[in-house]
Amino acid sequence: EVENLLGRHVGVSRLEGNEADLDVLQQLVTKGVLAKDDVRDWQAVGVVFGDILANELGLAWVSYEDERGVSKALRWRKTMNFVFPITLFSKRNQFNQSIDMHAIYAKLVKDVEAFRAPFHLR
């Protein structure tokens, strides 16, 4: 879905799956390609963003279950440290928060570094 939108609106036919894709995803936001209420497309962007996090930071997609149900999340190793990228942008949009792909990515990198700190890994 996202690659189709990127092809039509940004002129990019393929994503790399790494940090370089953040500029391309930001163009979707900046150009207003996604409708504010289009939760599905915003969540698709979250999946692509999550794939970038997984590839760059060594996280793995898992099913996370709590009292509210099951959702997909990224986990670092077999710890209880999770990131929930799928709903990240749809929720920000819902609450009228700005979306800066690089700033969000940088914050999550710091969060993951904090996960790793007790293990003395970077």
Task: Describe these PLM feature segments.
Residues 32-78:
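Amphipathic, interaction-prone secondary-structure segments
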Residues 73-122:
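A recognition module on extended beta-rich or small alphabeta surfaces enriched in W/G with H and D/E
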Residues 1-39:
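N-terminal low-complexity, intrinsically disordered segments
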Residues 26, 50-51, 102-104:
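Residue-level signal for functionally critical sites in structured catalytic/ligand-binding pockets
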Residues 1-3, 16-19, 56, 65-67, ...:
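Glutamate identity and glutamate-enriched acidic tracts
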